[in-house]
Amino acid sequence: MNDFPWLTIIVVFPISAGSLMLFLPHRGNKVNKWYTISICILELLLTTYAFCYNFKMDDPLIQLSEDYKWINFCDFYWRMGIDGLSIGTILLTGFITTLATLAAFPVTRDSRLFHFLMLAMYSGQIGSFSSRDLLLFFIMWELELIPVYHLLSMWGGKKRLYSATKFILYTAGSSIFLLIGVLGISLYGSNEPTLNLELLANQSYPVTLEILFYIGFLIAFAVKSPIIPLHTWLPDTHGEAHYSTCMLLAGILLKMGAYGLVRINMELLPHAHSMFSPWLMVVGTIQIIYAASTSPGQRNLKKRIAYSSVSHMGFIIIGISSITDPGLNGAILQIISHGFIGAALFFLAGTSYDRIRLVYLDEMGGMAISIPKIFTMFTILSMASLALPGMSGFVAELIVFFGIITSQKYFVISKIFIIFVMAIGMILTPIYLLSMSRQMFYGYKLINVKNFSFFDSGPRELFLSISILLPIIGIGIYPDFVLSLASDKVESILSNYFYG
């Protein structure tokens, strides 16, 4: 056990520091913004330092572990720890949240509350990724929903209350299944409740009970991922939310569902996962095609990007369902890759909206000459989204393909069919992404808005775009930087139960 409570400090620091904003001037928007950015940068540096000097990549076991008795009455522990599966998502959370606070500079209404909610969301997300106790995981999972709901309902488009209500109904409703699963799995077959994830990983259950647990957790994580048909909250939410909130949703929140699928469904319930994986494979394949074919019909720019996120999450589901070393590694790489790409596209969509106050693609056109820097960045990041070689998305999707090909679980005909359908989805992706760029930047200038300001990307926006682009290219050129973090943990998960 680590002597210094690194993870506790990393989890508690953002929300604690955010609470001090109550003492800052009410109208001091610049003070609030720079204070929040300073907190995020300090948190990211602290996280990076703690991981660089204390995390051993060749060790698949839990590291920086903390185990404190929290509530004596119900034998509840504050258990924290990281491994190769969670370290990437925690660093991604820190990076995207820091950039999202910088992207939120134009927010002036209730900026103190806005930035506090972002920091509270930050704590909840890192807490979810670093929890080693099932009940603590559930508490952090729920804690993160509260600031998200308020960010959605108070800042955004005209239908923001509708989208926020839809979001909370879906996520809070699915959390009931998560809570039932947590209580059921902890109380089974033991005189004392066991919530420790390390002990639960070695627990075995009757087949029927394991299937019931699996379904409960699957529903909760399918809503967050999202997996069709539980995805309908996502386009509405992205369509109405402020773009800095969209960056956090696409970059981090969706990845929590995929993380839960691996951490709980795959690691704790291996036999049920082996039984359900063919069905998940089918759903993931349908999801790629469905979202890629639905996206071109969306007039709203942010909704079109949201459907592209649904399509890309299909690759993660397929990688998890392949039950192979390359497949799971590819899924983890896609989690990180899409975190950057999704956040970048929503940021650029937001910067365009700041200038023309339009979200409907058929009302745009001919902006390439007026805003060449934004046009260039949007084009490059669209290429990243359609998995151009040299970008992170290409490597992730390619490794997922290898995962399906090398899988021992599926017949050759099944594998050929799945790869064929995935290939169709990859062909549809350039259609909706390139048509989106064409409608925005090419053709005649259709914009008819009074007093619109056509100034190009400023230093802040250019810095933000390049900051997200660099890791996308870096991972595309050298994916082993991410894969080496998780490879030992992936082998540890897969060695437990498959085909043994």
Swiss-Prot record:
Keywords: Chloroplast, Membrane, NAD, NADP, Plastid, Plastoquinone, Quinone, Thylakoid, Translocase, Transmembrane, Transmembrane helix. One of its GO terms (cellular component) is chloroplast thylakoid membrane. One of its GO terms (biological process) is electron transport coupled proton transport. The keyword RNA-binding does not apply. This is NAD(P)H-quinone oxidoreductase chain 4, chloroplastic. One of its GO terms (molecular function) is NADH dehydrogenase (ubiquinone) activity. It is a multi-pass membrane protein. Belongs to the complex I subunit 4 family. Its EC number is 7.1.1.-. It catalyses: a plastoquinone + NADH + (n+1) H(+)(in) = a plastoquinol + NAD(+) + n H(+)(out); a plastoquinone + NADPH + (n+1) H(+)(in) = a plastoquinol + NADP(+) + n H(+)(out). HAMAP family: NDH1_NuoM. The chain crosses the membrane at residues 4-24, 35-55, 87-107, 134-154, 167-187, 211-231, 242-262, 272-292, 305-325, 330-350, 386-406, 416-436, 462-482. It is found in: Plastid, Chloroplast thylakoid membrane.
